[in-house]
């Protein structure tokens, strides 16, 4: 029988079948960034001082930003896009003649962030060097008008958000339709929700974390040391010097580039010509192809970025800390009113998926609307900027930003099988339901559609799925149902006690590694549990084994050879009943089917022999 819990695969072919990735597949949009003038940049200066989180203030600030699309009359279609450390306001092309943007695959007409109907705003961050106030600007308190340099105040992600809040007020935006960002941009959108819980309808945080882990902190410390010990750093006042700390900044960037890639990406990119590097004019080692590449990237970076800005922004990222425990993160997001979409990447070791799951676990415990996907990729942290991976996760963003009035969720076109119909009949209307191994979400959609109420689901009527196959995650999300990417073999730590009325395990029991642990978890999280499973004591299977002396096999539900079956376990109705008795649960209802014959089997007709499928609802008394 096919398991409801699918093996993790991408929406593309598996790595084994498609061969090694091409260098083009691994090309980040960072490669197209330059120091060219920002032709579509807009500027606004705020005369009032900006108090800073760690003390002091900036007497005035200038914000450089770009916009796409048209703001509607009530300002409800505005999307804030937040960039990473080395990004800028130029997130996307404005027309065919424009320079490439760093998120061209995501922002534009007809794209997931659709500028035909959304008004997109992307500001250069405070502390940056592409138009907004930063260390390279004149210090108004300096008697000779020198740049701030290293005297630029120590700012935080919170200060960056406050500057963006001034811009939002200036543009007349009271609430963002969404705040979207990756890496450091993800930190910004999370801080937006922390500081202003009702500031956005949707929060999209990509390849990010609630705080940096110690390894990531260590890389940033080394990068700042490389810059600040460069003999040309001059205490940060190098702007009027003939030479700048380009060596230190280049080394910092080289180090950063390594953290943005993965082992697989680096092997694919550099092993084919490991000992045949492309020679470039550089003082840096070029014995290997990776050395030539890093030298090129490091030197190129010095032409468009300021060393003091790198120090300032990397420190702001390192100081960012929404909490290192689930309880602290729950406190951080307790008042949030938005829905959340979190996306991580399997090979990202700078902001590993486990850190996104920390946020997801806190949001789930708070009963916030959240969808989470871990995208399988070999591109590392840079995946959020790579076209192939944008094509994978972009549809999730498109769904989250869908106009529910003009573009309702994908029509359900639901065709339930008999065990799903039986589950549907058991669950009372208005129940909150968690579906483990939810597949394409059709059972949850049927539960929702049966007694649909206008507006978003309430806590009482909460519907949520757990799934690992990315095509199923997308299909479930396209139905407008929250779903999180999670391996059931790890239990259900994201959920709190009695969080749902019903927890469903549909056609998945036979694929679970630790059956007893998962059943106990279902009874902890749900007040009631429902399981459906294939009965391996079914008459045809017995006959096949006894008559032919071969591993049991039958048409339809059991049509697998012994060597390719997805099943780990081979439960029978009698065995499952015995196990439930050992777990001291009360069986509420049982439904048995001979699906092959299209017949319902009554309890007194020996279902252990005559049924190929069982549905059992149960609960635990004296919890």
UniProtKB/Swiss-Prot annotation:
It is found in: Cytoplasm. GO terms for molecular function: homoserine O-acetyltransferase activity. InterPro entries: AB_hydrolase_1 (IPR000073), AB_hydrolase_fold (IPR029058), HAT_MetX-like (IPR008220), Methionine_synth_MetW (IPR010743), SAM-dependent_MTases_sf (IPR029063). GO terms for cellular component: cytoplasm. It is an enzyme of class 2 (transferase). Transmembrane segments: none annotated. The keyword Transferase applies. It catalyses: L-homoserine + acetyl-CoA = O-acetyl-L-homoserine + CoA. Residues 1-17 have a biased composition (Polar residues). Pfam families: Abhydrolase_1, MetW. Keywords: Acyltransferase, Amino-acid biosynthesis, Cytoplasm, Methionine biosynthesis, Transferase. Pathway: Amino-acid biosynthesis; L-methionine biosynthesis via de novo pathway; O-acetyl-L-homoserine from L-homoserine: step 1/1. Residues 1-30 are annotated as: Disordered. Its EC number is 2.3.1.31. Residues 77-385 form the AB hydrolase-1 domain. It comes from the Bacteria. NCBIfam families: homoserO_Ac_trn, metW, PRK00175.1. PANTHER family: HOMOSERINE O-ACETYLTRANSFERASE. Transfers an acetyl group from acetyl-CoA to L-homoserine, forming acetyl-L-homoserine. Homodimer. This is Bifunctional methionine biosynthesis protein MetXA/MetW. It comes from Rhodopirellula baltica (strain DSM 10527 / NCIMB 13988 / SH1).
């Amino acid at each position: 029988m096919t398991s409801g819990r699918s093996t993790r695969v991408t929406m593309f072919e598996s790595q084994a079948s498609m061969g090694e990735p091409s260098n083009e597949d691994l090309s980040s949009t960072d490669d197209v960034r330059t120091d060219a003038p920002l032709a579509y940049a807009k500027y606004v200066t705020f005369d009032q001082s900006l108090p800073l989180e760690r003390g002091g203030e900036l007497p005035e600030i200038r914000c450089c930003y770009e916009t796409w699309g048209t703001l509607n009359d009530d300002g409800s279609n505005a999307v804030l896009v937040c960039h990473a450390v080395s990004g800028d306001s130029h997130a996307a092309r404005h027309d065919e003649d424009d320079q490439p943007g760093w998120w061209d695959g995501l922002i534009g007409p007809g794209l997931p962030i659709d500028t035909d109907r959304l008004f997109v705003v992307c500001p250069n961050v405070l502390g940056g060097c592409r138009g907004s106030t930063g260390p390279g600007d004149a210090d108004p308190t300096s008697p000779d008008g020198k740049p701030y340099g290293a005297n630029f105040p120590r700012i935080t992600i919170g200060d960056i958000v406050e500057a963006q809040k001034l811009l939002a007020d200036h543009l007349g935006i009271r609430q963002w339709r969404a705040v979207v960002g990756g890496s450091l941009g993800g930190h910004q959108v999370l801080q937006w929700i922390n500081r202003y819980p009702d500031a956005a309808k949707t929060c999209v945080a990509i390849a990010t974390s609630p705080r940096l882990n110690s390894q990531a902190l260590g890389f940033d410390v080394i990068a700042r040391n490389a810059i600040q010990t460069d003999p040309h750093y001059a205490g940060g006042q190098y702007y009027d010097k003939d030479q700048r700390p380009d060596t230190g900044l280049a080394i910092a960037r080289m180090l950063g580039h390594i953290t943005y890639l993965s082992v697989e990406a680096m092997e694919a990119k550099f092993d084919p010509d490991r000992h045949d590097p492309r020679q470039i004019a550089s003082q840096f080692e070029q014995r290997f192809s990776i050395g030539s590449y890093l030298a090129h990237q490091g030197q190129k970076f010095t032409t468009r970025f300021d060393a003091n800005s790198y120090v300032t922004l990397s420190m702001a990222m390192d100081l960012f800390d929404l909490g290192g425990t689930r309880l602290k993160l729950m406190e951080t997001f307790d008042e949030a009113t938005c829905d959340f979409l979190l996306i991580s990447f399997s090979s990202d070791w700078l902001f590993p998926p486990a850190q996104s799951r920390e946020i997801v676990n806190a949001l789930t415990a708070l009963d916030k609307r959240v969808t989470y996907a871990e995208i399988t990729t070999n591109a590392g942290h840079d995946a959020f900027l790579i076209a192939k991976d944008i094509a994978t996760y972009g549809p999730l963003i498109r769904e989250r930003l869908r106009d529910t009035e003009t573009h309702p969720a994908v029509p359900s076109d639901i065709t339930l099988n008999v065990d799903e119909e039986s589950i549907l009949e058991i669950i009372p209307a208005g129940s909150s339901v968690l579906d483990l191994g939810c597949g394409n979400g059709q059972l949850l959609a049927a539960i929702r559609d049966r007694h649909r109420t206008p507006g978003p689901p309430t806590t009482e009527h909460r519907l949520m799925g757990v799934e690992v196959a990315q095509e199923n995650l997308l299909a479930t999300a396209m139905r407008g149902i929250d779903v999180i990417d999670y391996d059931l073999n790890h239990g259900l730590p994201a959920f709190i006690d009695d969080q749902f009325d019903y927890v469903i395990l549909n056609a998945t029991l036979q694929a679970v590694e630790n059956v007893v642990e998962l059943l106990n978890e279902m009874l902890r999280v749900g007040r009631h549990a429902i399981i459906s499973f294939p009965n391996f004591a079914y008459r045809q299977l017995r006959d096949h084994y006894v008559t032919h002396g071969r591993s049991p096999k039958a048409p339809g539900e059991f049509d697998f050879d012994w060597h390719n079956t997805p099943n780990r376990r081979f439960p029978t109705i009698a065995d499952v009943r015995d196990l439930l008795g050992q777990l001291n649960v009360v069986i509420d209802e049982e439904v048995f089917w001979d699906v092959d014959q299209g017949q319902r089997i009554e309890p007194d007709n020996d279902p252990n022999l005559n049924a190929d499928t069982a549905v059992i609802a149960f609960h635990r008394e004296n919890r």
